[in-house]
Amino acid sequence: MKYLKPINEFWGDVLKRDLLGETREEDRFHNKKELQEYLISEIEKQGENVVIRNLDVSLLEDLSGLFKDITIIKTLDISGWKTSNVNNMMSMFRGCKSLESLDLSGWDTSNVKNMRWVFCSCESLKSLDLSGWDTSNVVYIDWSFCDCENLKSLDLSDWDTSKVAEMQSMFWGCKSLESLDLSGWNLSKVRFMDHTFYFCKSLKSLDLSSWNTSNVKDMSYLFKDCANLESLDLSGWDTSNVKDMGMVDMFFGCPAPYTVVNNKIVKK
């Protein structure tokens, strides 16, 4: 793909075609390398505040590691991307340590299976909008928000987690996270949830009473160092498949009214 026009003129043409509902073959990215080269050139031009809207990546399935370890970016506007065929977002924004806000609302994630590490180590991130995401095919969400240490709120209440198998360390180190509504999540296929809330020290309450944990094998360190988590409802949890040591230090450093006795969760 060649961009011979000045960038403003090029995007003016793209916008006109968007308004007319037109898509030209030459406006599509045909492989990941082509996309990465274009993004790097734009980031070098634009610096810490990057705007790259309305890209057609509908031919691509793999966006893993796309912005990984790009530490210069503070704000990123990538709204309007056509992502209908993407199935892999692993580590897509991992290590974007300076990124402060990101709005991905409305992205088509209906075919995504892998979100492992997608926002991991975005340690400056304060605002993240994922509204409208279709997660019905996601299998891996482990480590997805780990070390997002400045994120205070996150709305994942409408996520479809019915196919998720691994969610360990999902919110590890989200030490500023104050509220989280996961009460409606279907976790019937989840096998690993160890370290999920490790060091979420600002969380004060969690209602997980409706979680189906019948297939979980490892819950170790699940609420470790959740120092302010006093209200926690785990009533009805099934730990029959949790292996030996799979619940080690589950509530260590957590004031929640539970403990583990003979590999079972019991009230203190």
Give residue spans per PLM region.
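Negatively charged
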Residues: K2-K268
